[in-house]
Regions:
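Conserved non-cysteine loop/helix-boundary elements of the Radical SAM core domain that shape
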Residues: 1-141, 146-152
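Short, polar/charged, Gly/Pro-enriched helix-capping and turn/loop motifs at alpha-helix termini
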Residues: 174-178, 303, 380
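Hydrophobic packing positions characteristic
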Residues: 209-329
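A generic secondary-structure signal for well-formed alpha-helical elements
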Residues: 80, 110, 118, 167-171, ...
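C-terminal accessory regions of radical SAM enzymes
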Residues: 132-259
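Extended hydrophobic-aromatic, low-complexity segments
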Residues: 46, 57, 85, 300, ...
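Long, charge-rich, low-complexity alpha-helical segments
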Residues: 241-267, 331-382
Length: 382
């Protein structure tokens, strides 16, 4: 097997701070020590899977051992490394059924993202040289995209294109890796079927094929919520919906916090000198406040989402959480509702003590919360 891994990280040194560094190697060369190294770096690996079908891979001069590939990828998963797959549809002898099955396999390995695109029949390559003889019809000019083939007709290419767009929007841009397979199991669907349902739903909703560049992250989050609400309802699985939405909501907020730059908090000495109740504090832009159906910490502690288990064993007691970056990681604080509402009310327009008084939060309690929130970078304005 020779499926190349490409990686990129930010290299920090005196003369090249922030420089992007790219390199690559066959995935077969990954030792048990490499994944942990990748996990410790600011590094994203892109694995050129191309096709998960051994016969299709063999047609372009590759060998593919699924179990060996799975073992190597699980090393990456176990280490916490960030990685994605490149998948191509329309290779010689590829079919829509084979592509769907390969996508299902790829999703089962929990990649952080998937890049899916049609075959480019490049001149001078092995595939390009035999394209005419095996019936590959493609654009005559760059990017030489395959239009159809004997095994992958035009209509099937359109279906694969819609699947690729659904994956881009719902899975990759939607940062769904942590909950996607668990939600699919809760719906009693194969992962690829969940994407197909989303692609069909989005086409009906928008009236046309959409591209992920049309949506910002917040819009994709709302699309995920609306789609899943409808699908769980249609499949008469409403009792599992609250747990599914809690997972979707949390990981959206986690993704926001992961990319956010927190404010610089005061040091301990400065903090003690501030009269916080008289200050017009404001929520930091890096803070996300969200309500949940369940105690969100219980869901996080339960591991990969098992929606039936959550619905059966956990109580929908409700929780209110602050999700934010601090100390080089994403932090999650489960708050009592008055504290949540106090943070929610900090808009920088009125003294924080007035906000607390309106919510009937005792001044001493409010001060303790605000000191913690300011030290953690949840609020700013000092």
């Amino acid at each position: 097997m020779n499926y190349a891994v490409k990686w990129e990280w930010n290299r920090h040194c005196d003369q090249s701070a922030g420089q992007k560094v790219k390199s690559g190697a066959p995935i077969s060369s990954l030792s048990p020590y490499c994944p942990q190294l990748f996990a410790e770096l600011t590094c994203s690996l892109q694995i050129g899977l191309q096709s998960a079908d051994p016969a299709v891979a063999g047609g372009v001069g590759r060998t593919f051992d699924r179990e060996d590939f799975r073992r190597k990828v699980m090393l990456l998963n176990d280490s916490g490394a960030t990685f994605g797959f490149d998948l191509i549809y329309g290779l010689p002898d590829d079919t829509l059924a084979r592509f769907r099955e390969g996508l299902n396999f790829a999703l089962s390995l929990y990649p952080n993202h998937l890049d899916i695109f049609p075959l480019a029949v490049l001149p001078g390559t092995a595939v390009g040289n035999k394209a005419a003889s095996i019936g590959l019809q493609h654009l005559p000019e760059p990017p030489y995209t395959l239009q159809q083939s004997p095994s992958f007709p035009l209509a099937d290419m359109a279906v694969a294109r819609r699947l690729g767009a659904a994956s881009d929007i719902f899975y990759s841009r939607g940062k769904a890796v942590a909950w996607f397979n668990g939600v699919a199991r809760g719906l009693k669907l194969q992962p690829v079927e969940l994407l197909e349902h989303f692609g069909d739903w989005l086409l009906a909703k928008q009236g046309r094929q959409c591209d992920e560049a049309e949506f910002d992250d917040a819009a994709i989050w709302q699309l995920q919520r609306a789609f899943l609400t409808q699908l769980f309802t249609e499949r008469k699985l409403q009792k599992l919906l609250p747990a599914a939405l809690d997972c979707v909501d949390y990981h959206y907020a986690y993704g926001v916090a992961l990319m956010a730059v927190p404010p610089i908090p005061p040091d301990d000495e400065q903090l003690l000198q501030l009269d916080l109740l008289k200050m017009k504090l404001v929520r930091a832009s890096s803070l996300t406040l969200l309500p949940f159906h369940y105690e969100i910490l219980d869901i996080l502690e339960s591991g990969e989402p098992d929606l039936p288990w959550i619905a059966k064993h956990l109580k929908q007691s409700g929780s209110w959480a602050a999700i934010y970056p601090a100390h080089g990681e994403v932090c999650t604080e489960s708050l009592i509702r008055p504290y949540y509402r106090l943070l929610e009310g900090l808009d920088g327009k009125q003294p924080s003590g007035q906000v607390a008084a309106k919510l009937k939060v005792p001044a001493d309690d409010a001060l303790e919360l605000l000191q913690f929130a300011l030290a953690e970078g949840m609020v700013t304005g000092w």
